């Protein structure tokens, strides 16, 4: 199973490669759309990438339970040392 860094890096490398090919006009994609839309296409891709990342974010129930237990333990220690009420 690939780590998230490798998956993210693959997406970034692919995006940069496609952008460079279009920017250097090796692939004349950018000549078909107005110049003001070049950034818009990039922004749409960036927004989609963020939305996709949020939608596929894994919820770890075990980590949540462990974190809540550590918070309770820390509060108990702080109360014992009379730092908090």
UniProtKB/Swiss-Prot annotation:
GO terms for cellular component: dolichol-phosphate-mannose synthase complex; endoplasmic reticulum membrane
Q: Give, as in the UniProt entry, the pathway in which the protein acts.
A: Protein modification; protein glycosylation
Q: Which InterPro entries match?
A: DPM3 (IPR013174)
Q: What is its biological role?
A: Stabilizer subunit of the dolichol-phosphate-mannose synthase complex.
Keywords from the UniProt entry: Endoplasmic reticulum, Membrane, Transmembrane, Transmembrane helix
Record localization: Endoplasmic reticulum membrane
Instruction: Tell me how this protein sits in the membrane.
Output: Multi-pass membrane protein
Name of the molecule in the record: Probable dolichol-phosphate mannosyltransferase subunit 3
One GO biological process term: GPI anchor biosynthetic process
Q: Where are the transmembrane segments?
A: 13-33, 37-57
Gene of this entry: dpm-3
Which family is this protein grouped under? Belongs to the DPM3 family.
């Amino acid at each position: 199973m690939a780590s998230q860094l490798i998956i993210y890096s693959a997406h970034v490398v692919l995006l940069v490669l496609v952008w460079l090919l279009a920017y250097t006009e090796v692939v004349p994609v950018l000549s078909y759309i107005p110049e003001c839309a070049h950034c818009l296409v990039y922004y749409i891709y960036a927004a989609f990438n963020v939305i996709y990342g949020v939608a596929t974010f894994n919820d770890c129930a075990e980590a949540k339970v462990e974190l809540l237990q550590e918070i309770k333990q820390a509060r108990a220690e702080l109360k014992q040392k009379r730092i908090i009420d």
